[in-house]
Amino acid sequence: MNNEHKYLQWFSSQTKSIYWHDSAVRAEQQAAFANGATGMTTNPFLIQSTLNGDRAFWAGRLAAIPQDLKGDEKVYALMQCVTGYYAEQTRPIFEKGVPGEGYVCAQTNPNKTGDAEYMIEQAKILASWAPNIVVKMPATNAGIKAYEECAALGLNVAATVSFTVPQVLAVGEAAARGKERAKQNGIKPGLTIAVLMCGRLDDYLRDVAQDMKLGLDESVITMAGLAVAKRSYHILQEMKSDAIIMPAGLR
């Protein structure tokens, strides 16, 4: 057993944290769940990669897709081909009822990050595929508006493309507003997640440090993402928010 697997097994069994694996590749998911993962994330790029990389396995599901589909309808069919499969695979974990476990993420159109109404309607479609699907949308102004509306509808939602404390704070506030509206309308609130792309922040700062010839040690650079995650966590705790922080993009 390598050190990475030892860490993941310790992390998933000896801490209160949970982890999801960011991939749609079957071999990677099998290894991740064998080492304590309880959920997974996908995006359009990852779905396309796994379909292209394992055509033999997906052939049956792909053959069931009508050949005359175009535009969004074709995209939905391809996404459902993969996320629907994984939603079935993780359903037994989901049905145990442990918060944050047994979910699969499906992402809204990354080319529509400024169109709240489009994302809301797309989220309804993605969420209809299975009760354990979490809809990912960006932490842009439009995305946070859509996030609140989806939370008010009782959908499971995650705000991604988020790198800063203010973004997490805005997501936490939107989650609280949306869930309160759901309760007022007799709707059971879903899971609300605030993704924090720590690794991407580190990547940016690494490039800045190199460009400015600062000579910073790698351990100093990677403290930035950790600091943002800690600060965000404490703020959400002070707000008594039940939104889950998901550090992501880890290297």
Q: What kind of region is each of these model predictions?
A:
Residues N156-R251:
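Catalytic alpha/beta core domains of metabolic enzymes, predominantly
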Residues S17-S23, T38-T42, A77, G102-T108, ...:
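Hydrophobic faces of well-ordered beta-strands that scaffold small-molecule active sites
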